[in-house]
Design a protein with these regions (language model features):
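Conserved Switch II/interswitch segment of TRAFAC-class P-loop GTPases
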Residues: 94-98, 102, 106-108, 119-139, ...
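Conserved beta-strand segments of the P-loop GTPase G domain that flank and frequently precede/overlap
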Residues: 44, 89-90, 126-130, 156-160
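Beta-strand-loop-alpha "switch" segments that mediate conformational coupling across diverse proteins
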Residues: 161-207
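NTP-binding/hydrolysis catalytic cores, primarily Walker-type P-loop NTPases
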Residues: 202-247
């Protein structure tokens, strides 16, 4: 039975596609292939923009299978039955809908239904956050309005940090997560041009200093994600965090 790892944040531009593809690549590298030579790992795209599909198409060699599920809501319930050990799912952002209005915070359109179907299947959710204060509120909404009410285990990861800007931005973002009681990875995924060039996944990077460092971030996060395990992430809490999001 496949383990489903959903990469989700209401905010766009936080690196969901990057993380989905590279976590899939690392997992495929470590897991190897089945006796028939097929991969144990797939990356699925539920994003209508198709960023993960575009990036995967640019790879000379795909170490995983790539699945387009953006128009396939009927079969999402069957994903665990697919012949993979792990499936990493790239998801779209969505518009702000306050549940206090009585509406579903994911919305009622096709993609809201797809996100709900994915969360029904998810073993865990990876929530990328960047070190910018305008990312805090959508991250809070993703966790408080969606993940915690559904009881889905999750882990926040700080992504796309430019080291030249200083560690204070990481410390501030980590502190915000910890103040809200959100489990946040010790690994920080740094920003590198080799990531944004989108012609290779980290398992295909060269053995020079910069590309080794870029690759290391994802191997470290994959190890940390696996060691924590879905059952050890945030326990379901009664109620939600109602404090205003502070910059």
């Amino acid at each position: 039975m496949a383990k489903i790892h959903v990469v989700m944040n209401r905010k766009g531009g936080v690196g969901k596609s990057l993380i989905s593809l590279n976590m899939g690549a690392v997992c495929a590298d470590v897991r190897g292939t089945r006796p028939d030579g097929q991969p144990y790992v797939a990356v699925a795209s539920a994003d209508p923009q198709g960023t993960a599909l575009w990036r995967a198409a640019r790879l000379a060699v795909q170490p995983f299978d790539i699945l387009d599920i953006a128009d396939d809501i009927e079969n999402i319930a069957l994903m665990k039955q697919l012949p993979y050990a792990h499936i990493f799912v790239d998801t779209p952002g969505w518009a702000e809908i306050n549940p206090e209005t009585g509406l579903d915070p994911l919305g009622e359109d096709k993609y809201g239904r797809i996100l709900r179907a994915l969360l029904d299947q998810a073993d865990d959710v990876i929530v990328p956050v960047i070190t910018e204060v305008d990312c805090y509120e959508p991250t809070w909404q993703t966790i408080e309005w969606v993940l915690k009410p559904l009881g889905v285990p999750f882990q926040v990861v700080i992504n796309n940090w430019p080291p030249a800007e200083g560690i204070a931005y990481v410390d501030g973002t980590r502190g915000w997560c910890e103040d809200h009681g959100y489990p946040v990875a010790q690994t920080v995924i740094r920003r590198y041009r080799v990531h944004t060039n989108a012609t290779r996944v980290v398992t295909q990077y060269n053995n020079n200093r910069v590309e080794l460092q870029a690759r290391e971030d994802f191997y470290r996060f994959a190890l940390e994600h696996g060691l924590r395990g879905a059952e050890t992430r945030l326990p379901v809490q009664a109620g939600t965090d109602t404090e205003a999001v502070e910059a």
